Amino acid sequence: LLNRDTSFLKKTLLVGDLFSESLRSAIDKFVVTYSAGITSYLNNINASSPFPRLADMWKKIMLKSHFIAAADTTNLMAEIAQVNRVNTLTASASTTPDEMRYLALPFFGRICPYETPAGKKLGLVNTKAIGAKVIDGMLCTPYRKVKRTSNGIEISNKITYMSVKDELGKKFGDILTLQKDANGNYMNTPIIAKIPNPEASDEPFIVATIDAFDLAGGYVAAHPEQFLSPTAALIPFACCNDTNRITFGLNQIRQAIYLQN
């Protein structure tokens, strides 16, 4: 999912694409095996029977690929989380280095930083954020333009979706740190922002404190909670750094069995 050399998110493949690729590969092997079995049909009729091979093909696709968690239907929220699941394609979860599991700035608005299973799949099985959308195979997140005005700055209502590549060279401010005066105008107070890295580095962005008016020409998030998954957004005060509380809450929501009348 993430290319650590450039901090770019790689192209996102849909479940249907992965399934089609696995099915085509399995069918090719099945045809070869079945054709060879036909030659020994008279000696052993079971050797050419397609049903055992079809069963083996199906088991390989469902159990040895990335579809093992394709049917989490404990409750409605578990289904929603499953629909928004994003898996990192890797050969083995047990041998994947820790560098592939870490959070990165390009994840903002695309991958929820909290909703990931513990254990070997930590950081490899993730959940798409609320505002994230797959456009041309890339995970994009919505922003709003910041414009310079006579009173300082104002935020446009127009939504612009950007991929990680589109973000290069632009400034992005934290909308929660912007403050307004009594007249409803934004004040030139310090804010937290993601700005281009002035030094030559593999990381294209750094997090810094800048004046609000310096954000003119840049962008802010379309919604304060767009970096959270739909399930994580239900946790009260999820914007704080209490990771354990949020993780436990997510597990409880997904595993709850609701009572019926």
Regions found by a protein language model. Name each.
Residues 3-115, 125, 138-261:
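Long, charge-dense accessory insertions within large macromolecular proteins
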Residues 132-138:
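Covalent nucleotidyltransferase core used to form phosphodiester bonds in nucleic acids
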